[in-house]
From Swiss-Prot:
Designated name of the protein: Aspartate--tRNA(Asp/Asn) ligase
Molecular function as annotated in GO: aspartate-tRNA ligase activity; aspartate-tRNA(Asn) ligase activity; ATP binding; catalytic activity, acting on a protein; nucleic acid binding; transferase activity
GO cellular component, one term: cytoplasm
Binding site for ATP: R221, D222, E223, Q230, E482, G534, L535, D536, R537
InterPro entries: Aa-tRNA-synt_II, aa-tRNA-synth_II, aa-tRNA-synth_II/BPL/LPL, Asp-tRNA-ligase_1, Asp-tRNA-ligase_1_N, Asp/Asn-tRNA-synth_IIb, AspRS_core, GAD-like_sf
Entry's Gene Ontology BP terms: aspartyl-tRNA aminoacylation
Region ranges (Aspartate): 199-202
Catalytic reaction equation(s): tRNA(Asx) + L-aspartate + ATP = L-aspartyl-tRNA(Asx) + AMP + diphosphate
One Pfam family this sequence matches: GAD
HAMAP family: Asp_tRNA_synth_type1
Residue stretches spanning the membrane: none
Site (Important for tRNA non-discrimination): H31
UniProt entry tagged with the keyword Kinase: no
């Protein structure tokens, strides 16, 4: 029979109406001549009552039903008695009087209950992902992912963008993460690479006259995994020709605002704040700052460069930094808690943590005696500190100071419960450095990628201050998480060649990897740029999920394996032979 309603749709307005439901047996309770079945589909759950007095045949079938049996039930909606109303259930005011029950499929006893209140090891959930996805929270995540994707498509379509698919089998051009390689059977010894992003193809689409492009792109990176990374992921990829950076950022603000309004019912204030990369690093120690709370970093290097405290003085003399955080009313921290904070920053390379407590009559600190009153007053004033505050300092190389204090800032905000719930702070971080120096490789590397356009007025700094060349790059940050990153692109062959020269990549090597792009630039490629939003991360933030694996239907584990399909797996020797490959293990 044709399904007439979904379980979660049944309300008091349908009392007396005959319905046909299809779904799973969530739970079964036997009360002798009455059997109750909680029936579930992706809309919700409803209670079905099988009564021996009115329908002994249906009761006999119901007696055989177990959890996760697939059922078709015909019955009449009726009101529950007042004492049996379940206020915690959307359909809690009604139930279905079963007239006919048909078992469409049986089920083995599941390895875990399909229930939100049951704590299940994640590896078990991933092994039986098809069961895990039946849970309402996972159904909600998958639905919201679909809704977000549809809203993005609709918005971009309304603004003149067209969706274009780019190749999945392409050329390996490693400059960053490792590529996933695919051997070619027809071209012995040659390999395709799965795309890390559609970067080159979307630029070629701009050269092709496709002025407004987008794609929900699948991307692949063979890198060491972290909690918020997957070897394969999706991004909302957008590129546009003939526009100014500010114009494009405003368009993206409108798109993100639409998502917040339609998905969360939240009206965002526009325009979003702008903060330069340098300001973000100076104030927060991070290029993805969380602006929902204070605890800003303060540079006191100039105030302590002549202090008697040797650690601070020598750090500044060796071109290091001394920065601190003022913790409001931190005088309540015990010495053990401060020692724990010291151990915490050591995890990020800091050698230690100096501290001062501002008491009513004095400064309590093992290092206070090494500073003059003038130096102490300067530190307190610079940090905006008040009586009762705890001042925490790290003295080290600028990179270590930034990393350790940004992590400490976040740690303290959580410890002190300073992060407001249900608040969303979006900001653009702009004017990134074009390059950063890689000590291991002994050369400069692109901070984003080598196709990012520099501010042309900054190019004169290449000889003496290459790290000060700014990029026309912009990241969108939400609550301390980068959700999108983009830039204006280089569209002229000469500037692109110069960029590779800056990066220490020989021109011949660059042409061997990217010659097709250089050639396209010789045929009138327009000015263009774009952005990519991490779809998985965006859905994770919208749903409040703790793991990115909870917003992907079939994710990989931390070691890039699939517990359900047991991928990756060894393949047949004949397959390897056809590909002209041999394995060493």
């Amino acid at each position: 029979m044709k399904r007439t309603h979904y379980c979660g749709e049944l309300t008091r307005e349908l009392v007396g109406k005959k319905v046909v439901l299809k779904g799973w047996a969530d739970n079964r309770r036997d009360h002798g001549k009455l059997i109750f079945i909680d029936m579930r589909d992706n809309s919700g759950l409803v209670q079905v009552v099988c009564d021996f007095e009115s329908n002994p045949e249906a009761l006999e079938v119901a007696d055989s039903v177990r959890s996760e049996y697939v059922l078709e039930i015909t019955g009449t909606v009726r009101e529950r008695s007042p004492e049996n109303v379940n206020p915690d259930l959307k359909t809690g005011e009604i139930e279905v009087d079963c007239e006919d029950i048909n078992v469409l499929n049986t089920s083995k006893t599941p390895p875990f209950f399909i229930n939100e209140n049951v704590d299940v090891d994640e590896n078990i959930r991933l092994k039986y992902r098809y069961l895990d996805l039946r849970r309402p929270s996972m159904q909600n995540n998958i639905y919201l992912r679909h809704k977000i994707t549809k809203l993005v498509r609709d918005f971009l379509d309304e603004n003149g963008f067209i969706e274009v698919e780019t190749p999945m089998l392409t050329k390996s051009t490693p400059e960053g993460a490792r590529d996933f390689l695919v051997p070619s059977r027809l071209h012995e010894g040659s390999f395709y690479a799965l795309p890390q992003s559609p970067q080159l193809f979307k630029q070629l689409l701009m050269a092709s006259g496709v002025e407004k492009y987008f794609q929900i792109a699948r991307c692949f990176r063979d890198e060491d995994l972290r909690a918020d990374r997957q070897p394969e992921f999706s991004q909302i990829d957008i590129e546009m020709s003939f526009f100014e950076q500010e114009e494009f950022m405003k368009l993206m603000e409108n798109m993100v605002s639409k998502l917040f309004k339609e998905v969360l019912g939240i009206e965002l204030t526009k325009p979003f704040p702008r903060i330069t990369y340098q300001e973000a690093m100076d104030r927060y120690g991070s290029d993805s700052p969380d602006l929902r709370y204070g605890l800003e970093l303060h540079d006191v290097s100039d105030l302590v460069k002549d202090a008697e405290f040797k650690v601070f003085r020598e750090t500044v003399a060796s071109e290091g930094q001394v920065k601190g955080i003022a913790v409001p009313q931190g005088q309540e921290f015990s010495r053990k808690e401060i020692d724990d904070l010291t151990e915490f920053v050591k995890e990020f390379g800091a050698k230690g943590l100096a501290w001062m407590v501002l008491e009513e009559e004095e400064i309590k600190s093992p290092i206070a005696k090494f500073f003059s009153d003038e130096e102490l007053d300067g530190i307190i004033d610079r940090m905006g500190a008040n009586t009762g505050d705890l001042l925490l300092f790290v003295a080290d190389e600028p990179e270590i100071v930034a990393d350790s204090l940004s992590k400490l800032r976040e740690h303290l905000a959580n410890k002190l419960d300073l992060i407001p719930s249900n608040e969303y702070q979006l900001t653009w971080v702009i004017d990134f450095p074009l390059m950063e120096y890689d000590k291991d490789e002994g050369r400069y590397k692109a901070l984003h990628h080598p196709f990012t356009s520099p501010y042309e007025d900054d190019l004169e700094k290449y000889e003496n201050e290459p790290e000060k060349i700014r990029a026309k790059a912009y990241d969108l940050v939400l609550n301390g998480v980068e959700i999108g990153g983009g830039s204006m692109r280089i569209h002229q062959k000469e500037l692109q060649e110069k960029m590779f020269e800056f990066l220490g990549i020989p021109l011949e090597e660059a042409k061997q990897k990217f010659g097709f792009l250089f050639e396209a630039f010789e045929y009138g490629t327009p000015p263009h740029g774009g952005i990519a939003f991490g779809l998985d991360r965006l859905v994770m933030l919208f749903t409040g999920s703790q793991s990115i694996r909870d917003v992907i239907a079939f994710p990989k584990t931390a070691n890039a394996s699939c517990l359900m399909t047991e991928a990756p797996a060894k393949v047949d020797e004949n397959q390897l032979k056809e590909l002209h490959l041999k394995t060493t293990k």
